[in-house]
């Protein structure tokens, strides 16, 4: 089973909704079944958010705001896109999307209760080991 960034898992607003999805993963896998997911790292958010970033893409500029609700471990994400060649206006990010982020320790605890064992974790597709200083958290697990 494969779950990549911008998918449903790890991108829902609260623990209840995410736990429903985690349970579906566990039930869908046979013993020995493998799961790989790519989520934003909650440990990174604890020390690096709030922040604002910009990304110059091929067709436009994206301004992103990352706010952090520490008590809920929830990212409030907003963005504004500007297409090259169009007039700029003052960015207003009225409402952001709330996303509950998890640390590797939290995912390990949740998965353990569901019969999933974490085999490895990475920070990117090169195989770099995960750390609290990397925004991506890729987790490889097996159903036991």
Model-derived features: where do they sit?
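A short SAM/SAH-binding and catalytic strip from SAM-dependent methyltransferases
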Residues: 1-17
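Short, hinge-like loop/turn segments at secondary-structure boundaries
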Residues: 2, 52-56, 137-138
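Short catalytic/ligand-binding loop motif for oxyanion handling, primarily in non-cytosolic enzymes
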Residues: 10-12, 43-47, 130
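Short, glycine/charged-enriched secondary-structure capping and boundary segments
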Residues: 16-19, 50-52
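A short glycine-rich, Lys/Arg-flanked "PGG" loop and its adjoining helix->strand segment in the class I
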Residues: 18-31
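SAM-dependent methyltransferase
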Residues: 36-108
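C-terminal lobe and adjacent flexible extensions of AdoMet/dcAdoMet transferase-like proteins
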Residues: 98-144
């Amino acid at each position: 089973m494969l779950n990549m960034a911008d998918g449903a898992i790890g991108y829902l607003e609260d623990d209840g909704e995410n736990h429903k999805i985690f349970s579906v993963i566990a039930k869908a896998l046979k013993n020995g079944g493998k799961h790989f997911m790519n989520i934003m790292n909650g440990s990174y958010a604890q020390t690096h958010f709030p922040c604002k970033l910009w990304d110059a893409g091929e067709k436009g500029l994206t301004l992103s705001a990352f706010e952090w609700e520490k008590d809920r471990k929830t990212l409030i994400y907003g963005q504004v896109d500007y297409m090259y060649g169009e007039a700029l206006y003052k960015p207003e990010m009225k409402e952001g999307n709330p996303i509950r982020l998890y640390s590797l320790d939290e995912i390990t605890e949740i998965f353990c209760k569901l019969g999933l064992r974490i085999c490895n974790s990475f920070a990117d597709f090169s195989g770099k080991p995960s750390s609290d200083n990397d925004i991506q958290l890729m987790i490889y697990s097996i159903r036991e």
